[in-house]
Amino acid sequence: MPASPEPVTATPEPEEVPAKFTLEAADIAVVVVYFVFVLAVGIWSSIRANRGTVGGYFLAGRSMTWWPIGASLMSSNVGSGLFIGLAGTGAAGGLAVGGFEWNAAWVLIALGWIFVPVYISAGVVTMPEYLRKRFGGQRIRIYMSVLSLILYILTKISTDIFSGALFIQVSLGWDLYLSTVILLAVTALYTIAGGLTAVIYTDALQTVIMVIGAFVLMFIAFDKVGWYEGLLVQYEKAAPALTVPNTTCHLPRSDAFHIFRDPVTGDIPWPGLIFGLTVLATWVWCTDQVIVQRSLSAKNLSHAKAGSVLGGYLKVFPMFFVVMPGMISRALYPDEVACVDPDECQKICGAKVGCSNIAYPKLVVELMPVGMRGLMIAVMMAALMSSLTSIFNSSSTLFTMDIWQRIRPRASEKELMVVGRVFILLLVALSIVWIPVIQTANSGQLFDYIQAITSFLSPPITTVFIMAIFWGRVNEQGAFWGLMVGLVVGMVRMIMEFVYGTPSCGETDLRPSLLKDVHYLYFALILLALTVLIITAVSLCTAPIPEKHLVRLTWWTRHSKEERVELEDPWAKPAGSDLSTTESEGSDEDAPAWWKRAGMWLCGLSQTTKQDLTEEERQALEKKLTSIEEDHMWKTVCNVNALILLTANVFLWGYFA
C-alpha cells in the first residue's frame, strides 16, 4: 500500500499499449502551459522563502497559513496512485474503499489536537527526532529513519511511478521511460531549488487543479450513466461478455453499494475498516514525516488545526470524484474494465490478473472533451509530481537530520543543505532504476503487497508514538523491544504473503488460514495489541525515565514552563550548532563567478556573511518555534469546525453504510 490509507487494485504494468488517439494541439498546449506555470510558482515561492537555513528549507520557516497546509495535506496523500488505485478498487468492489478516505477525517483531527501540540512544544523537525528526545539513545531514532526511507523507496516512489506510467501509457501511448524521466527531472528541479515552501505552494496549486478536473470528469461520467440511479442499475449488470466457466468472479459484488461489509466474508470487513484502518491511518497522518512536516510548518497551532479541518473536509470528496467514477467506468466499459479471462485481459491491458486499474484513465480518454483531456493529463502528472516532491523533501530531511548527523556530528549548516540536495538526486536515480523492476515484477502482487506492507510494518510504530505521548512510564527499552518484536511478527506474515501469493479467478485457495481468514486490517489490530503488551511489560520491568526529562514531551506536560533536562545523547552536536544558529560564511572579497552564484542559490547558500544569533535572539526564536498558545477566538472557531466536520462524517458513514 502506498503509505497512505488507500488500497490499490492489483494490475501488472501493460507491456504494449497502442496510442488510443493522437493528442490534439489544444491538449498539448494545455499540458505545456500548465507545466511552465507550475515551475514559475515553484521559482517564485523559493525566491521569497527562507531557504538558507535547515529550519527554513525543511519546515518552510514555520510561516505557512492554514489553507495551503490543508490543501497540501490532501494533495500529498492524493497522488496518481490514489486516482488509479481507488478508482480501480471501486470498479472491482464498489463503495467500501471510499471508507479509507472518510476515516482520515478522524485521524486528521487527532493530528491537529493531540499530536501536533506535543511535537511543537517538544521543538522537533522530524518524527525520529521526537523519539530521540522522548526516549534518549539513538537506536530507536536510527531504526525509524532507516525503516521510513525503505518504505518510501519501495512503496511510495514505486507506486507513484507505476501509476503515473500506467496512466501515460493507457491514455497517450507515450514511451514509458521518456515521460517518467522528464517528470522526475522537473519534480527534482523544483524540490531542490525551493525546499518545503515550493512544495507547499505547488501542492496547493495542484490540489485545486486536480479537484476541478476530477469534478468535471465526474459530472460528465454521471451524466453519461444516468446519475446515481442509473449507476445503481448499470453497475449491477456490469459483467464482461467473456467469463471463466463455473466461477462468479465476473459478477459485481452484491454489497457493492454498502460501505459496511460482513465482518467474516467481506472483502473489506467493517470492524477492520473502522478500527484496523485507524491504526494504519494514525501512522500515515500522525507519525509519518511526509504528512506531519506539513502541519509543523504552520505559523501557529491554530493554523495547524485549521489545516487539519480543511484536509478532513477535502477527504470527503474522493468517494464522489474517484471511487464512483471508477464504478461508472466499469458500468460503461465492462468488457475492458471488468475482464476476468486471463488471455482477454492480457490483450486489453497487458495484465492477466485483471484490468480494473485502467478504469480512471479509460474514462479520461473516452469522455473528456479536447483541451480538458490535456488538463486531466496535466493533473495526473501533477498528482505524481506532488507525491514524489513530498517524498523527496521528507526523505532528504530524514537522511540529513537523522542519519548524516550521526555519521558527521559536527557537519555545518552548509554541509547539511548540500547533502540534503544530493540525497534527492540519489533518490531520483534510484527511482529511475526502479522503473524496470516495477515493469518486470508481478505488479499484481506488488500492489497487493504495498497495502500489506503498511499493515505489517506500521502498527508497532503507531503504538510507540501513542504510548510515548500518553504514558510517561514508557521507557526506551520498552519502546525498542516493542518495535523489534512487532517488526519480526509483521515480517513473518509479509514473507508468508510473498511465498503463497493470492489465487486468481477459478483457482483453489491453498493458503494457510492465517493468510486466508485473517484480513490484513484485522492483523494490524492483533499486531497493535501485541506491541502494547510487549512495551508495557518491558517498561514496567525496567527503570522509568525521570520526570525532569519528559517536560513538554508528553500530552500531560505539553504546557509545562519548567526547563527540560535533555537525556544524554553521545552523538549530540556541540552547543551552538543547532537549527537556530546561522554560521558565518566567510565571503571572499571578490564577487564569485555567475555560475558559482547560481549554484549557491540552487543549494540555498547565500554569499552574504551572516552573524551568529545572540543568546537572547536564540531564546526568543526558540520560544516562538515551540509555542502552542492560541488566541481564544480562533481556538473556538477551530473546535466548532472540527465538531461540524465529524458530525458530517458520521452522517455520511450512516447514509452509505
UniProtKB/Swiss-Prot annotation:
Cytoplasmic side, ranges: 46-79, 126-147, 202-207, 287-307, 397-417, 473-478, 542-636
One Pfam family for this entry, by name?
SSF
Provide the transmembrane region boundaries: 25-45, 80-100, 105-125, 148-168, 181-201, 208-228, 266-286, 308-328, 374-396, 418-438, 452-472, 479-499, 521-541, 637-657
Glycosylated at which positions? Answer: 246
Q: Membrane topology for this entry?
A: Multi-pass membrane protein
Member of which family? Answer: Belongs to the sodium:solute symporter (SSF) (TC 2.A.21) family.
Q: What is this protein called?
A: Sodium/glucose cotransporter 4
